[in-house]
Regions:
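A transmembrane-helix-recognition feature enriched in membrane-embedded lipid enzymes
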Residues: 1-59, 110-115
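Non-catalytic C-terminal accessory region of glycerolipid acyltransferases
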Residues: 4, 129-242
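Conserved H-X4-D acyltransferase segment
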Residues: 6-13, 42-98
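Short, basic, glycine/proline-bearing loop/turn elements
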Residues: 46, 118-122, 152
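Short, flexible loop segments at the rims of nucleotide/cofactor-binding pockets, characterized by
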Residues: 49-52, 73-74, 122-126, 155-156
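Short, hinge-like loop/turn segments at secondary-structure boundaries
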Residues: 76, 113-115, 195-198
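Membrane-embedded segments
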Residues: 80-134
Length: 242
């Protein structure tokens, strides 16, 4: 029954919401080059997708974040629905780091660029480092938070080792890095599936880690700490409840 609902109800409405909100966002970008209006529309899009998919999101730990602060957010990534959940329930103006190849896709590439999202070139270590340096400069200059999936993509099982880009950007920009964990989304929409199951997921926020005084030589240790923190945030929900 839930598969038929997903196929005949949720997926068509997701496609419709994406077309409508994407068009509105692109039009809004003609008048607002800051990306703020596009982000507000993306938040509405995220909530719409979760609603038609019958996915509820419970947040924990948002009080740990300064509403006026700038952060580098890092999160685990297990499902396509992670992005709508983060847009809908993380109450910050933030931008994503997105694969450079996405910017070559008609309509999508122009929208990402106008919304202020940052392309990542992974063709070589030098190109990747240049992307990270440019991203750090944008964070420091604009005071806009960014969000990265340091696993480098969706993980079909467990938590993969983190790449150091988030730690590099946070240290270079001199802003705190905040670990996030999304628990339960893999069960509702696993990789390779179009069967969206109804249910609840948890978006849990860890303690922000300050980077003031850290040099780039400390990015490996910061990266290891971020991995441990996200792992622990996930373990809180995986542990048996007494």
């Amino acid at each position: 029954m839930s598969f038929l609902r997903s196929l005949l109800f949720s997926i068509p409405l997701i496609a419709l919401a994406t077309i409508v909100m994407g068009t509105l966002s692109l039009l809004a970008s003609l008048a607002d080059r800051t990306g703020r209006t596009q982000h507000q529309l993306a938040r509405f899009w995220g909530r719409a997708l979760l609603a038609v998919s019958f996915i509820r999101v419970r947040t924990e730990g948002l009080e740990k974040l300064d509403p006026r602060g700038t952060y580098v957010f890092v999160a685990n990534h297990a499902s396509y629905m992670d992005i709508p959940a983060l847009l809908a329930y993380l109450p910050f103006q933030f931008r994503f780091f997105a694969k450079k190849g996405l910017y070559r896709i008609p309509f999508l590439g122009g929208h990402l660029r106008r919304a202020g999202h940052i392309p990542v070139d992974r063709s070589s270590p030098r190109a990747s480092l240049k992307s990270m340096s440019e991203g750090a400069h944008i964070v420091a200059r604009r005071g806009t938070s960014v969000l990265l999936f340091p696993e480098g993509g969706r993980s079909p099982k467990g938590l993969r080792q983190f790449k150091e880009g988030a730690a590099y950007i946070a240290i270079k920009a001199g802003v705190p890095v905040a670990p996030l964990a999304i628990f339960g989304m893999r069960r509702l929409l696993p990789m390779g599936s179009i069967h969206i199951r109804p249910g609840e997921v948890v978006l849990r926020v860890g303690d922000p880690i300050p980077t003031a005084g850290l040099g780039l030589s400390g990015r490996a240790e910061l990266n290891r700490r971020l991995f441990r923190d996200v792992e622990q945030l996930l373990d809180v929900h995986m542990a048996p409840q007494g």
